Amino acid sequence: ASDVYKRQVDASSVNAPDVPETGVTFAENSLLKARAVAEATGLVAIADDSGLSVDVLNGAPGIFSARWAGSHGDDTANLNLLLAQLSDISSEHRGAKFCCAASVASPNGFEAVEYGELPGELLTAPAGEGGFGYDPILRPVELNGENALYEGQYAGKSCAEIPAEIKNSISHRARAFEALIPQIAAALAS
């Protein structure tokens, strides 16, 4: 595995194309990006697409998470719009999860996608300064309750209030890429 890290290159360093996210799922968008970079560079490529899925919104904002309020990447506007949309929703109906589809594609056509999720509950107001996006309003379920990870040390905390190394260890991206490792090895061997 350490050899893989020695050989990694950033997409921008090989003039990889900027790929429009035209898919209708996280998996489709992730594969579009990995496939385009693999085809353009002749290298094995990995990519991901991720976002927030809110139960009472039937999975929205989903693939539109980064542009929920209209402008791509306006985290504050996205977060404020979502909170306004959920303002009359009681705490027992504020279930949500961060979702990630991570993919690998090789120039010879090998493709694979793996998924990761971080289930949680949405707070009614932002809490914390860390992270980005919707981190200030998602409280991870597994850090709360009887079987809480880290002995309940982070109970009640949003993703923006917990240390980055803790958040990263339980994140949807970490889980998706951990699941993708065998597929990356297979792509490199293909």
Residue ranges: model-predicted function:
Residues 1-5:
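Short, small-residue-biased leader/transition segments that mark boundaries at the very start
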Residues 6-190:
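Anionic-ligand binding patches
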